[in-house]
């Protein structure tokens, strides 16, 4: 299983990686500070889970999620955001993510999202 974590904040990115490693110790967890680098990786190697920041105001995370969904329609997407739930709800829900977290999410909440993915991972 490959989990791709994307956040432009190094501390948050490290936290996402640590929690992904806890949830799936056997997974290949890749980290990226930009949507562009993450997309380059996914185009070459694919991924099963995309754990990404929405990243206003440019909404790079939504753009990335749309592109990754075209590559793998059954990719599990978990959005992480500083936004309130309503700010980007329509755009987020159109992508049918596996989860949605705020940046204040606890390790337990992140683990719960990773353990309740929409699409099963082999």
Model-predicted regions and their roles:
Residues 1-11, 16-17, 50:
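Conserved acidic segment of CheY-like receiver
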Residues 63, 84-99:
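Alpha4 helix (beta4-alpha4-beta5 surface) of REC/receiver domains from two-component response regulators
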Residues 54-55:
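The short loop immediately C-terminal to the conserved phospho-acceptor aspartate in CheY-like receiver
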Residues 34, 60-63:
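Acidic catalytic/metal-coordinating carboxylates
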Residues 31-49:
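Acidic, metal-coordinating helix/loop segments flanking the phosphotransfer/catalytic sites
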Residues 105-115:
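C-terminal output helix
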Residues 10-30:
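Two-component/phosphorelay signaling modules centered on CheY-like receiver
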